[in-house]
């Protein structure tokens, strides 16, 4: 029989799952919470996200080296332009994203 888990048991199972590449993820930002999490096993895409139900999304990878973010403003401009090109609204203004990253 398939078990029915309560919330705590579900989260515990989720945290026990192996996540390939998790050792390469230092943290992620969850815009719905307005917070950063350092447990990559909790990084999930919600079902109502454009990425899931429409298959579109904008991604930007930023290099962080020697305690500095490299070319942040150029990355943020590209992020905004890419989102506009797909008619997507960013979850918050670019200035706020900049503050979150820094």
Predicted feature residues:
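Conserved alpha/beta cores of soluble small-molecule-handling proteins
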Residues: 1-102
């Amino acid at each position: 029989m398939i078990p029915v888990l309560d919330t705590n048991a579900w989260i515990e199972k989720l945290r026990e799952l192996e996540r390939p590449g998790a050792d390469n993820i230092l943290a992620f930002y969850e815009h719905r919470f307005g917070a950063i999490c350092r447990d990559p096993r909790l990084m999930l895409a919600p079902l109502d996200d454009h990425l899931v139900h429409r298959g579109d999304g904008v991604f930007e990878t930023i290099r962080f080296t020697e305690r500095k973010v490299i070319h942040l403003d150029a990355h943020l401009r590209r992020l905004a332009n890419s989102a506009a090109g797909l008619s997507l609204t960013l979850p918050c203004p670019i200035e706020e994203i900049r503050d979150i990253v820094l």
